[in-house]
């Protein structure tokens, strides 16, 4: 933990659009095997700390529905519900593993112990402020 690794040439690379399921079972990439799928923090290419930046987009190809995410946080955790198997939800609905996807705006894991990460320490008298926008729509 604490390494900011490049995504190029790995199943973690979503810089060009492709389906989440296309590479999720590429267990030659050890991190996908350990997490049973995606459960990783992505470092955003931000222009300036605290600025609102484009973070992620997810599109359902048949209907064209999309979710776009913008945030002031330095990272986004991508989680593909790898451990949901048999989870019971509203009105008895059951959810198998990988039946959902989450985009979570956040600081990097283990930030307080990594001096080279943006600080998340909140000292007395200071405020924590962040903005995350989830935009929903339909592409034609």
Question: What positions do the PLM features span?
Answer:
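An exposed, glycine/acidic-rich loop-and-rim segment of catalytic or binding clefts
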Residues: 1-140
